[in-house]
Amino acid sequence: MDKVELEFYFFMKGQAGSFTTNLFKTIMSADFGNQYKLSFGFPDEVSVVQKYKNEDGYWENLLNKFDNPESV
């Protein structure tokens, strides 16, 4: 699991810091055009949110990687 995925995990669990929380909330609420603009400064964070929104099973796989690291 990379650093951004770990930050996203903590965000989703309500345990992220204020900057990370506000960043992910902003990315998640942005339309495609604004996500594109945000990706210039935060490419990995935007990528994780897009995977979460568009890839079936992404969140479940992320949970599995965090909760069962030996199984990955």
Ranges and model annotations:
Residues 10, 27, 42, 66-67:
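Generic low-complexity, intrinsically disordered sequence content enriched
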Residues 28-60:
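Short, charge-rich amphipathic interface segments used for partner binding and complex assembly
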